Amino acid sequence: MDVRQGIHSEHAKALDTAGLRRHFLVENVFAPDALSLTYSHIDRIIVGGAWPATRPVEVPASLGAEMGVSHLLARRELGAINIGGPGWVEVDGQRHAVGTEEAIYIGQGGQGVVFGSDDHARPAKFYLNCAPAHTAYPTRTITLAQASPETLGDAATSNRRTIYKFIVPDVLPTCQLSMGMTKLEPGSLWNTMPCHTHERRMEVYFYFNLAADAAVFHLLGEPGETRHVVVHNEQAVISPSWSIHSGVGTQAYTFIWGMAGENQVFKDMDHIAVADLR
């Protein structure tokens, strides 16, 4: 497991390109037939991917020892969104079907977690976020139709997009984890602009549906000290609460957002005018 320490904004603004990438970019989210995880000290979120390319991928019991508990979800909850072919997730001996662009929430205490594909010619790919939890809520799946869609932006400002809120209080209860997916329409390039911060939670963006020769220029940093990280397909960026999180691509793309912290109200944001960015 890759462990990332938290970082102060005063330190972050002094970093060069390599330093910014080392602290904030998760380059290798997926590995075939493996569970890849990055542990951030920022709100103790775990970011990762399970890719059952040729065989099922099990959450190993050894992860519990790394976390100082009996098993990974002994004091955590987990959300996963499938960006690949149809698949399934087994929890406590029960198998749950999770189709393409569908999600599953696994409550605190879940054991025997296994990720699988229906067809290895088109394997599932599960992007996951995992956060500390204090209460056990039921495991359940969420379809795209159930994900509280909201369309925002305008083609004239190159940011027409639909937000699918899979794991939010209006859909199901969680301790603190929120997750969703934003799909940009063809010709739209910007996400989350005008941008914002949120003092009461952190966020991770995971970008996908990008061609091999495409990229997203992800903006981060304090509003008056912005920096950028170049992100390619199926890579993630960690955003502390003090940082903006926005981006512009060389083509339209999709991204998954995940948040952990003390407030789950989706609109709890500190908005920043474009004129105030530096």
Swiss-Prot record:
GO BP: any one term: D-galacturonate catabolic process
CDD domains found in the cross-reference section: cupin_KduI_C, cupin_KduI_N
Binding-site residues, Zn(2+): H196, H198, E203, H245
A GO MF term: 4-deoxy-L-threo-5-hexosulose-uronate ketol-isomerase activity
Reactions mediated catalytically: 5-dehydro-4-deoxy-D-glucuronate = 3-deoxy-D-glycero-2,5-hexodiulosonate
Domain of life: Bacteria
Disulfide bond sites: none
Pfam families in the record: KduI
EC number: 5.3.1.17
Family statement: Belongs to the KduI family.
The protein's name in its UniProt record: 4-deoxy-L-threo-5-hexosulose-uronate ketol-isomerase
Organism: Burkholderia cenocepacia (strain ATCC BAA-245 / DSM 16553 / LMG 16656 / NCTC 13227 / J2315 / CF5610) (Burkholderia cepacia (strain J2315))
Source species taxonomy: Bacteria, Pseudomonadati, Pseudomonadota, Betaproteobacteria, Burkholderiales
